[in-house]
């Protein structure tokens, strides 16, 4: 059980050696604890510092009085802080030993180590942010593309919350009308039912759009599993290294160099690709290489996108034809590489339904067009999230689906003329599911699941 009345502390910068580390204290005794082990030349106490101020001085070992480090301490007094509590943030030199020593001092003075996500959990419990905004913090930290960053920022700024609150306001009005007729059955219900049904149908349409957006933008959120395939020495590893921006695969003129599948995450025109580079296909008696080819076939089957690389300077081979056949029905882009040495295969690909891009990868020719074609193949002509309300969280999507189910149950109960109390029960269920998204309706179990995804220090 997390004890919110206690003062907590944690290192909030990444572990390891760096220029600066930051240790955060939050709670009613945060400034008092920091003040007891902080000294500045003027002798003034941190308790007297103005909120949102930075104080220069030294942190002392409370057991010996020895100076531990030269620091800056940021003071934020409740409610004007991330947690809406008194907060002291100590910026010290970035070594794991010294930050550990300072953390030990704070614990000795009465703070306890924070649980994962506990600072953000307190921000939620103290009303600074709702649960959807709290989850946006994780999205912001984990974003890998511009689209992911923007969607997380909009969620943090309340775009999801505002939409959910609009839905709840409309359905709350519908429920209030329905409950009025439970209390006063002699009233004429027909006019009110027309309004209630209109609100419910409108809410279902809005929920459908939100759920559709979740699936439409799944590639931007989770990335697309992508297999780079082709016969040996056609430029697969060069393409992999180009997309990743680093040398993850050995590039040599010798066939058969890449014998294993190489994982990597690439940002291609704002679309994250989870890339698999595979062993090239050719006739071989090498058992190790044969295993690589077998795994290539497996990666084709499990991938969502195939980048099929063909050597444009040579006629199509039986292995090229084999891969073209093997990838039929898959979402794919055909890359005709080495066109700086000639292009004798493009006409032979004219019947392919997949887009064909001509490149000279090592020379950098055709790469911008390739990036655009890859994105268009996966996401169509979508230009981006463009300010629309996007559901990016599986928990939110599940809650929306449950809310929609309850609304459909209400319409069925209404059609079957079931008692008003049962109809109202379904409307309340829809409202509760929406409330779980923002935390208006929540349980300790939901909070534990949400904040277990956070790291210590956030």
Spans of features found by a protein language model:
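Generic enzyme active-site microenvironment
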Residues: 275, 309, 335
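Short glycine-/small-residue-rich Rossmann-like dinucleotide-binding loops
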Residues: 244, 279-280, 304, 311-312, ...
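A glycine-rich (often HGG/GG-containing) alpha/beta subdomain
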Residues: 1-150, 154, 158, 333
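Short beta->alpha junction loops/turns
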Residues: 26-27, 95, 255, 312-313, ...
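Inter-motif core of Ras-like GTPase G domains
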Residues: 289-313
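C-terminal-of-GTPase-core extension/linker across diverse P-loop GTPases
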Residues: 2-11, 15, 58, 146-267, ...
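Conserved beta-strand segments of alpha/beta enzyme cores
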Residues: 112, 272-274, 355
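Switch I (G2) and immediately adjacent beta-strands of P-loop GTPase domains
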Residues: 54-77, 256-284, 299-305
């Amino acid at each position: 059980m997390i004890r919110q009345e206690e003062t907590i502390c944690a290192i909030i910068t990444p572990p390891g050696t760096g220029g600066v580390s930051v240790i955060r204290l939050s709670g009613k005794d945060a400034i008092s604890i920091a003040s007891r082990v902080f000294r500045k030349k003027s002798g003034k106490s941190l308790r007297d510092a103005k909120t949102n101020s930075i104080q220069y001085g030294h942190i002392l070992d409370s057991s010996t009085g020895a100076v531990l480090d030269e620091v800056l301490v940021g003071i934020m007094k409740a409610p004007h802080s991330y947690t809406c509590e008194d907060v002291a943030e100590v910026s010290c030199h970035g070594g794991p030993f010294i930050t550990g020593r300072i953390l030990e001092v704070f614990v000795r003075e009465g703070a306890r180590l924070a649980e994962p996500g506990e600072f953000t959990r307190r921000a939620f419990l103290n009303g600074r942010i709702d649960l959807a905004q709290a989850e946006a913090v994780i999205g912001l930290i984990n974003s890998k593309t511009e689209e992911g960053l923007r969607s997380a920022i909009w969620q943090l700024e309340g775009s999801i919350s505002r939409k959910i609150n609009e839905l709840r306001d409309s359905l709350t009005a519908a429920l209030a009308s329905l409950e009025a007729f439970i209390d006063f059955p002699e009233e004429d219900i027909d006019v009110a039912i027309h309004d209630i049904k209109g609100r419910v149908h409108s809410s279902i349409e809005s929920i459908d759009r939100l759920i559709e957006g979740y699936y439409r933008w799944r590639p931007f959120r989770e990335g697309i599993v992508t297999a780079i395939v082709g016969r040996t020495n056609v430029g697969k590893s060069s393409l992999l290294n180009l997309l990743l921006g680093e040398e993850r695969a050995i590039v040599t003129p010798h066939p058969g160099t890449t014998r294993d599948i190489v994982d990597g995450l690439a940002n291609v025109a704002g679309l994250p690709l989870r890339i698999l580079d595979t062993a090239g296909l050719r006739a071989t008696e090498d058992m190790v290489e044969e295993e690589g080819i077998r795994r290539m076939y497996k990666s084709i089957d499990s991938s969502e996108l195939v980048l099929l690389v063909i050597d444009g300077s040579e006629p199509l081979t039986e292995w090229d034809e084999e891969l073209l056949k093997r990838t039929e029905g898959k979402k794919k882009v055909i890359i005709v590489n080495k066109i700086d040495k000639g292009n004798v295969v493009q006409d032979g690909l004219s019947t392919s339904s997949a887009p064909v891009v001509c490149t000279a990868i090592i020379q950098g020719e055709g790469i911008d067009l390739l990036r655009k074609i890859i994105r268009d193949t996966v996401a169509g002509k979508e230009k981006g999230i463009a300010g629309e309300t996007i559901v990016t969280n599986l928990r939110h999507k599940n809650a929306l689906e449950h809310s929609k189910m309850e609304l459909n149950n209400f319409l069925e109960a209404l059609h079957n003329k079931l008692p008003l109390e049962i109809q109202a029960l379904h409307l309340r269920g829809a409202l509760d599911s929406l409330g779980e998204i923002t935390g208006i309706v929540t349980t300790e179990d939901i909070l534990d699941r949400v904040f277990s995804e956070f790291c210590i220090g956030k």
